[in-house]
UniProtKB/Swiss-Prot annotation:
PTM summary: Phosphorylated on tyrosine residues after serum stimulation or induction by v-Abl. Seems to be phosphorylated at Tyr-53 by ABL1, required for nuclear but not for synaptic localization.
Function statement: May act in negative regulation of cell growth and transformation by interacting with nonreceptor tyrosine kinases ABL1 and/or ABL2. In vitro, at least isoform 2 and isoform 4 suppress the transforming activity of Abelson murine leukemia virus (v-Abl) after overexpression in fibroblasts. May play a role in regulation EGF-induced Erk pathway activation. Involved in cytoskeletal reorganization and EGFR signaling. Together with EPS8 participates in transduction of signals from Ras to Rac.
PANTHER family listed in its UniProt record: ABL INTERACTOR 1, ABL INTERACTOR FAMILY MEMBER
Main location: cytoplasm
Residue positions where Phosphoserine is found in the record: S183, S187, S216, S222, S225, S292, S296, S439
Protein name: Abl interactor 1
Cellular localisation: Cytoplasm; Nucleus; Cell projection, Lamellipodium; Cell projection, Filopodium
Subunit structure, interactors included: Interacts with ENAH, Abelson murine leukemia virus V-ABL, ABL1, STX1A, SNAP25, VAMP2, and through its N-terminus with WASF1. Part of a complex consisting of ABI1, STX1A and SNAP25. Part of a complex consisting of ABI1, EPS8 and SOS1. Interacts with EPS8, SOS1, SOS2, GRB2, SPTA1, and the first SH3 domain of NCK1. Component of the WAVE2 complex composed of ABI1, CYFIP1/SRA1, NCKAP1/NAP1 (NCKAP1l/HEM1 in hematopoietic cells) and WASF2/WAVE2. Interacts (via SH3 domain) with SHANK2 and SHANK3, but not SHANK1; the interaction is direct.
Location of the SH3 domain: 419-478
Originating gene: Abi1
Length: 481
């Protein structure tokens, strides 16, 4: 505020007075210069003096005008800021008035209303009259309610007539199987016992080996080695017929559960010469399915480097039996076997419930035994792959040297760079993949001018500069001996 008052009272009026004085001085200076130019003998000197007065007078007037204009602009800025402050204060006052009016209006509205007395009570109030509990009445289940619902109504009415009552029930109960599924002789080791609420099936002795599949004396000599005895005939799960000396349904039903079940097999024959290191007779006594599966997997994978994956029409042919029985070939639809479990004895759990019924249903559909193959079929279906080629003998130094002729041994050619790192020879053929690469044949001479950190070199070969892999060349110093 003081600055505004000083501008209005002092600076701006003084600027006006200075301009008026300059105006009067300019009039007097003009009269003097005119008289001096007329009366002076030296006109040039008088003209120069007139120019000097004119320049000084104009500069003085321009300075005074500039000072007065700055003072006026500063005055306008101060007044504009004061106007903004006044506007803000006026807006604040108007908002305060509006708030006061709203308070007064609410107070007046509150006067017109009546007070409501609320009594505080508990949120949960017990009912005054307790409801009597409804007695439960058991209603019999009507199984015929949904008989006329669904797409089978038309078929039933067309077949049995509209007057016949519809069938009650949707599941047909089949007759119990005539035989129980094979169970291990000792069931106390499992997690389910007789004293548990879930009843188990009675153990049944495993079936004996039929006489048709006994080991023949003609094939005893070629099946005494432990490696061939361990490779079992892995039967698919869809067949329940016996294979070789097993002759039981345990090969089909129990394979889906993975429970080891002992299978009695004939003792190994003593006729024929035994191979050195043959397994003793105790190894042929009992073999579980898990161990046989593990042995068949390991023997088939260790004989060759590749294992043929089972397909929809896989062929099992020419595998020796577990106990030295005859060889059989069977074409069947197979499923990929699960990974071989660890060869350890697990508690034998009897099969109960749905699994046992499914096993009996599968086992009750026997399949005819497969015919024996001719004697000239090999023992294993997958022959081992050919051995890898022998390694190259590098004892002779000439075998490892790339044969090349260096036409630039005496001196570098004209297209060779003046400054290069080393001179290398190509040990492989290389065809460029990009435009900035080199293409060369084995034995080409290349002058390296730069080595990159990524293994690529930059060099010159036959007047062409480009990049090439560093592992395709060798330093020429290695071959100068």
């Amino acid at each position: 505020m003081a600055e505004l008052q000083m501008l209005l009272e002092e600076e701006i009026p003084s600027g006006k007075r200075a301009l008026i004085e300059s105006y009067q001085n300019l009039t007097r200076v003009a009269d003097y210069c005119e008289n001096n130019y007329i009366q002076a003998t030296d006109k040039r000197k008088a003209l120069e003096e007139t120019k000097a007065y004119t320049t000084q007078s104009l500069a003085s007037v321009a300075y005074q005008i500039n000072a007065l204009a700055n003072n006026v602009l500063q005055l306008l800025d101060i007044q504009a800021s004061q106007l903004r402050r006044m506007e803000s204060s006026i807006n604040h006052i108007s908002q305060t008035v509006d708030i006061h009016k709203e308070k007064v209006a609410r107070r007046e509205i509150g006067i017109l209303t009546t007070n409501k007395n609320t009594s505080r009570t508990h949120k949960i109030i017990a009912p005054a009259n307790m409801e009597r509990p409804v007695r439960y009445i058991r209603k019999p289940i009507d199984y015929t309610v949904l008989d006329d619902v669904g797409h089978g109504v038309k078929w039933l009415k067309a077949k049995h007539g509209n007057n016949q009552p519809a069938r009650t029930g949707t599941l047909s109960r089949t007759n119990p199987p005539t035989q129980k599924p094979p169970s291990p002789p000792v069931s106390g080791r499992g997690t389910l016992g007789r004293n548990t609420p879930y009843k188990t099936l009675e153990p049944v002795k495993p079936p004996t080996v039929p006489n048709d599949y006994m080991t023949s004396p003609a094939r005893l000599g070629s099946q005494h080695s432990p490696g061939r005895t361990a490779s079992l005939n892995q039967r698919p799960r869809t067949h329940s017929g016996s294979s070789g000396g097993s002759g039981s349904r345990e090969n089909s039903g129990s394979s889906s559960i993975g429970i080891p079940i002992a299978v009695p097999t004939p003792s190994p024959p003593t006729a024929g010469p035994a191979a050195p290191g043959a397994a003793p007779g105790s190894q042929y006594g009992t073999m579980t399915r898990q161990i046989s599966r593990h042995n068949s997997t390991t023997s088939s994978t260790s004989s060759g480097g590749y294992r043929r994956t089972p397909s929809v029409a896989a062929q099992f042919s020419a595998q020796p039996h577990v106990n030295g029985g005859p060889l059989y070939s069977q074409n069947s639809i197979s499923v990929a076997p699960p990974p071989p479990p660890m060869p350890q004895l697990t508690p034998q759990i009897p099969l109960t419930g749905f699994v046992a019924r499914v096993q009996e249903n599968i086992a009750d559909s026997p399949t005819p035994p497969p015919p024996p193959p001719p004697d000239d079929i090999p023992m294993f279906d997958d022959s081992p792959p050919p051995p890898p080629p022998p390694p190259v003998d590098y004892e002779d130094e000439e075998a490892a040297v790339v044969q090349y002729s260096d036409p630039y041994a005496d001196g570098d050619p004209a297209w060779a760079p003046k400054n290069y790192i080393e001179k290398v020879v190509a040990i492989y053929d290389y065809t460029k993949d990009k435009d900035d690469e080199l293409s060369f044949k084995e034995g080409a001479i290349i002058y390296v001018i730069k080595k990159n950190d990524d293994g690529w070199f930059e060099g010159v070969c036959n007047r062409v500069t480009g990049l090439f892999p560093g592992n395709y060349v060798e330093s020429i110093m290695h071959y100068t001996d």
